[in-house]
Amino acid sequence: MDRNSCLNYFQAFPFWEHMTEEDRNFLLDNIRELHYPAGAAIQSEERQCLGTLFLLKGVLRVYLLSAQGKEATLYRLRDSDICTLSASCMLSAITFDVQIDAETDCDLLLLPAVPFSRLMKNNIYLENFIYKRTTEHFSDVIAGIERTFFMTLTQRIAAFLLDEAADTGSDELALTQEAIARSIGSAREAVSRSLKK
């Protein structure tokens, strides 16, 4: 993406009009364009606190990983969404690390953590925008927690499949039992048994 395309992209955000010319140029000078193929780990235990990810195209999965290797999906991001938890080390209220994988081929822009931190300190509008986006995603996290604690496995699978159909706009889904299990925080064998009922 060339500089003019980046400029057009960022002008759509409400914080842009409140940035100084110096900060705008600083943002554009530090933005990096990235591409990840489906299945790639974008942020993991080895690679934490990348910065803020602006998803141009694709689907990202944001999840927690236990010491035992169990995964719990927090939420998914789709075209034109922003991943703020990829910069969790710069957000003082966030005290946990997340994993981020590309579920499909993804094109995104990265504002690395250090430039992101400087811009957040300089601009209350950007800071407010980032915290607002973060809190919006927490409604998805709470919904996931509610499902885990208050729904049966069969209900969780059904809710997940309905959400996926709504998100993709299709009644046909191509998912493995392993992918369903990872997404709902269960074991593949348990999902398999439940689907056979």
Predicted regions and their residues:
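Glycine- and acidic-residue-biased ligand/ion/polar-headgroup-sensing regions
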Residues: 39, 50-63, 78-80
